[in-house]
Amino acid sequence: MPKFSPFRWDCDKQGCFNTKCRPDFGVFYDCFPGKGSFTDIDGIIEINGKLLLLEWKSKPDTIPVGQQIMYKHLSRKCDAFVVCVSGDAETMQIDHALSFSKGHMGRWIPISTEQVVELFTKWAAFAKGGKESRNVRQGQ
């Protein structure tokens, strides 16, 4: 287990996190044209101006078009590396991943949680200014 955990919520003591803390974006639906709305980002970290976004899916299905557009733009314009993973959020077992890098979307590939941990560790070294790994930018 990691030495540090920023998530300090105890559902047994404080109630269901989703009920108590997850915003209902419905109040903002009429603010945007068409079907545009806020999306939740499952995880994001910034190191030296570089962004790593994590999107969790329960299975390796088609990424919604709106998210594809957003992730392509973010990866092209904001030095963001977006990784979508699929798996079991309760057990944290990841089975597939795809990435968005430099405006392009990859395809779902089989991958393990351990491999994603390794990918994120390499990305952090790259973001901190270490030797860039081509594999990190390509999501492999």
Task: State where each predicted segment sits.
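Intrinsically disordered, low-complexity and often Lys/Arg-enriched segments
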Residues: 1-2, 140
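Active-site metal-binding core of divalent-cation-utilizing nuclease and nuclease-like domains
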Residues: 2, 9-47
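Catalytic cores of nucleic-acid endonucleases
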Residues: 4-6, 31-38, 58-104
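Domain-level recognition of nuclease-like catalytic cores that cleave nucleotide substrates
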Residues: 10-25, 88-140
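Conserved catalytic cores of phosphodiester-cleaving nucleases, focusing on short active-site segments
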Residues: 43-45, 49-59
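Alpha-helix C-cap/termination motif
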Residues: 46, 74-77, 126
